[in-house]
UniProtKB/Swiss-Prot annotation:
Subcellular location: Golgi apparatus membrane; Cytoplasmic vesicle membrane; Endoplasmic reticulum membrane
Organism: Bos taurus (Bovine)
Lumenal side: 1-15, 90-108, 171-235, 300-368, 423
Transmembrane segments: 16-36, 69-89, 109-129, 150-170, 236-256, 279-299, 369-389, 402-422
Protein name (record): Zinc transporter ZIP13
Amino acid sequence: MPGCPCPGIGMAGQRLLFLAALALELLGGAGGSQQALRSRGVAAACRLDSKESESWGALLSGERLETWICSLLGSLMVGLSGVFPLLVIPLEMGTTLRSEAGARRLKQLLSFALGGLLGNVFLHLLPEAWAYTNSASSGGERQSLQQQQQLGLWVIAGFLTFLVLEKLFFDSKGKEETSQAPSKDPAAAAALNGGHYLAQPAAEPGPSAVVRNIKVSGYLNLLANTIDNFTHGLAVAASFLVSKKIGLLTTMAILLHEIPHEVGDFAILLRAGFDRWSAAKLQLSTALGGLLGACFAICAQSPKGVGTGVGVVAVRRGALAEGHGRPDPGIRARLCSGPPRGMGGGRYTWPPSPPQPVRAPPPATEETVAWILPFTSGGFLYIALVNVLPDLLEEDDPWRSLQQVLLLCAGIVVMVLFSVFVE
């Protein structure tokens, strides 16, 4: 017809219009879906931020703030035990080490320190690591054996680490010159060299050589003490997370254990060349390790919903009844009955209905406890057997050798008594 468009052109136009409409629809849908995805992502981020703020708010809540204060104060008290040797060792000890009486007294203190180090390793650190491995093992005897072998490897790793550190800062020539340097008092020189007088005086080494080589073992001992105090901070904080009573008992137990150990460490620092006040100040500086351990233990519990995690160190310090796997009556309520009254409900009943087991420790704390105890044991073994024992073996006088052996046994007996009656 004359007024109608061509049928072919009409079909092509309709197809173009249809395709254009379809493209616009797809573009609009894609834009809408992208906007929806963007809005969902913003909402998820907001939820994560709110959860993060809630977790950190719980970390700094009133009840947890009290745990923070008690844990940090307890760790600080353990660190302040480093000043106890100032009350035991006479004031003139630091200035009379080059006299005959001072050198002999230092060897007596070193004998006690050697016994304390060996007792600390074999009666305290390694048994705790062994007990933790057995309690954490759930894969049968084969897995338990592998974990115990890993403990041995960590002990060797700690020993070798301290060996490498001393090699890095050790000058054998300087030490040889230092060991043969003449003393102003010949009797003191004889006491320090196993009762033998030096036949010929050697050249006096420079002050830098003496300072650099004498103090290597002292710095290694400070490093080992810092790591050991880190584990003490873990124990104190984890115990306060259980209850204030358990936290106080744990703090007192660690304090009683640390006092004889600090006396031995003080003697090692004096042997390394530190004066009395410098040794005391450096002993106090190791308290920073305890504070870091306490902060690590508390922060590992709350943020991002990690869990309770108090079983790691609190169990090692006697928070659970020995041999039964059941919480002590004093802490049963907190472990299994939920929040206290006024904090969300929950009654203190035992056993709960249904029973609620204690949740597994957080991975970070678990991995830390798994290696830090045997690693510290290896470091203490290196200090005892490489830095302290050779000085005692140089003694030739039978009576003084007997005194040193008796003092060594006394150091071990003290650790045995604290392990039996305190922990």
